[in-house]
């Protein structure tokens, strides 16, 4: 029985490979478009929730994998999650600066919850908590993971010729067949490529931590200026409104960033 959707189903079936190949570029374009397009608070809430859920899933996968090549796509995942966090930071900063004077719920329920529930509505406490999280993420986890990735890449590349010679020796001795030798050579190459990629990808995590600090400072000073000059708010009103929203926004981005940093440290 023919249905109105049958031609569409055939088109999807015939172009499945093309669509799979285009999925990653389209995802990158969609993430980067969040930096440019204004997002309503409801969409921000959804994207922040997805961001936290993805960070948790990545950390759980990193915790339970047996060897690094089990998660060979991790450098790409690291790039995409970093881009998503930065895009959400830019989008939420835009909403905070444009609509912050209307009240604490201007940037959505998630930022409001982080600003009121986690730090008790006190922006000074929020700044202290954010500073502690930045120290943990930037100084402890990220710096250690970056050094581990650098050393792992160096030692893996140095050991690569020896591993390939060992495979050739086992093949010549008859301990393995040609098929197993090809598999082992491919595994050695993939391992070297993975650790080399992780050495570069760890810089994304470090840069993301620095960007979080700068975005928070820009949002605070920009919010003060907009609140006092454009909306005639007093200094205390501007502080209570914009700093609370800025700190809530920073915490929403910093917690997934910390989870991804821990995952990167586990992988390498």
Annotate the PLM regions.
Residues 29-31, 50-64:
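Central hydrophobic cores of alpha-helical transmembrane segments in multi-pass inner-membrane proteins
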């Amino acid at each position: 029985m023919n249905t109105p959707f049958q031609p569409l189903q055939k088109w999807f079936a015939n172009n499945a490979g093309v669509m799979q190949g285009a999925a990653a570029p389209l995802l990158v374009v969609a993430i980067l478009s969040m930096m440019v397009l204004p997002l309503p608070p409801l969409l921000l809430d959804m994207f922040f929730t997805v961001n936290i859920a993805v960070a948790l899933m990545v950390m759980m996968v990193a915790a339970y994998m047996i060897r690094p090549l089990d998660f060979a796509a991790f450098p790409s995942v690291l790039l995409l999650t970093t881009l998503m966090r930065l895009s959400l930071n830019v989008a939420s900063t835009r909403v905070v600066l444009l609509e912050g004077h209307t009240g604490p719920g201007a940037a959505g329920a998630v930022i409001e919850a982080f600003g009121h529930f986690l730090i008790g509505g006190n922006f000074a406490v929020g700044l202290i908590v954010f500073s502690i999280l930045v120290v943990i993420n930037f100084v402890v986890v990220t710096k250690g993971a970056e050094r581990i990735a650098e050393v792992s890449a160096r030692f893996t590349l140095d050991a690569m010729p020896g591993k390939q010679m060992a495979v050739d020796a086992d093949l010549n001795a008859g301990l393995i067949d040609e098929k197993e030798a090809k598999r082992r050579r491919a595994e050695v190459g993939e391992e070297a490529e993975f650790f080399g990629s992780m050495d570069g990808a760890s810089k994304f995590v470090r840069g993301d931590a620095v960007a979080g600090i700068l975005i928070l400072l820009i949002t605070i000073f920009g919010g003060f200026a907009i609140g006092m000059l454009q909306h005639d708010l007093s200094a205390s009103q501007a502080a209570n409104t914009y700093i609370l929203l800025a700190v809530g926004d920073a915490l929403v981005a910093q917690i997934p960033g910390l989870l991804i940093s821990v995952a990167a440290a586990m992988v390498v």
